Swiss-Prot record:
Protein family according to the UniProt entry: Belongs to the PPase family.
Binding site for substrate: 31, 45, 57, 141
Top-level taxonomic group: Archaea
UniProt entry keywords in alphabetical sequence: Cytoplasm, Hydrolase, Magnesium, Metal-binding
Stated role: Catalyzes the hydrolysis of inorganic pyrophosphate (PPi) forming two phosphate ions.
Binding site for Mg(2+) 1: 67, 72, 104
Protein name (Swiss-Prot/TrEMBL): Inorganic pyrophosphatase
Protein's GO biological process: phosphate-containing compound metabolic process
Lineage: Archaea, Methanobacteriati, Methanobacteriota, Stenosarchaea group, Halobacteria
Catalytic activity: diphosphate + H2O = 2 phosphate + H(+)
Subcellular location: Cytoplasm
Amino acid sequence: MANLWEDLETGPDAPDVIYAVVECLKGERNKYEYDKDIPGVVLDRVLHSNVHYPSDYGFIPQSYYDDGDPFDVLVLVEDQTFPGCVIEARPVALMEMDDDGEQDDKVIAVPEEDPRYDDVEDVDDLTDQQKAEIAEFFETYKNLEADKETAVLGWGDAQAAKDAIEHAQDLYDEQFA
């Protein structure tokens, strides 16, 4: 079985078009994580708070971010996919986030093959409501976990997301290539 983090390239035209490996599903509370040692998707925990993922959430292959994990990506989808699904996606924003004192930014992306998002190219193309719902989730999803604190610090544009992806690719190459 292929290792989706190490064997799959970052994307067909990274950083402009990336692969997003789905771990967590839109509308669910289950926090799945890809375990490269199995390799497969395992249930990490069920969110303690009564909140649900606002969209499909996972990681970018062959990336490693400042928090010591593969780079996180939230792909805006109308309907959930499944854990382990690989989505060809276009980065449109970077949500800058702090998780317990560590930088834990998230790439916000849209599916390349969904016509509903053909006109979404940058952070300004997202509605205020979309950004508010995403931020609300990430600011509250750990509220009922002991001694956990998260904060959304701001929003970067598509270029900031692409620059962060290139940074995560460089870190991956330094650590694992």
